[in-house]
Amino acid sequence: MTGVQTCALPIFAFIVDPIDGTTNFIKDYHVSAISVGLAKDGEKYIGVVYNPYLDEMFTAERGKGAFLNGKPIHVSRNPLSEGIVLFGTAPYYEELSKKSFEMAHAYFKKALDVRRSGSAAIDLCSIAAGRAELYFELRLSPWDFAAGALIVEEAGGVVSTVEGGAVTLGQKCSVLATNGRCGRLE
């Protein structure tokens, strides 16, 4: 047999963050999670985020909805003025800190309040469960957002880059996740 052979099976890849919110975990501040995403042909396919402190398991499979401990969840319908904004400060990128806090302040003026937890996975799941309305961070690695972004989307939310582009699993990028009623700063 000669020539190139190809495999007809889809390509799967796990994208894992064994401790999302590492600094919180080290400091015994109980806001961290285990985040496991499964990509199929480069796209988000399955997402699982487990918060061991609250015994909360968030799950989603593309096209099948999002769940918290087996019960369906959905993003809130609140407008930004009645919403909580969650944000991350991209702590490993000092050059982004000023812009992160400027954005948080701008959202603070328009929203009910703002919060910073230190766990992107938990923040994304908070959007999915309707506990908050918007989350942003100016630079995340795929293992930070792969599982949580799918959970948000399957709960009826919208995930993009802060700039409005598509979030891809192949590189670091900014992330903006919303309930669909809240959006980018103008």
Residue ranges and their predicted role:
Residues M1-L9:
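Short, small-residue-biased leader/transition segments that mark boundaries at the very start
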Residues F12-V31:
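Glycine/serine-rich anion-binding loops at beta->alpha junctions
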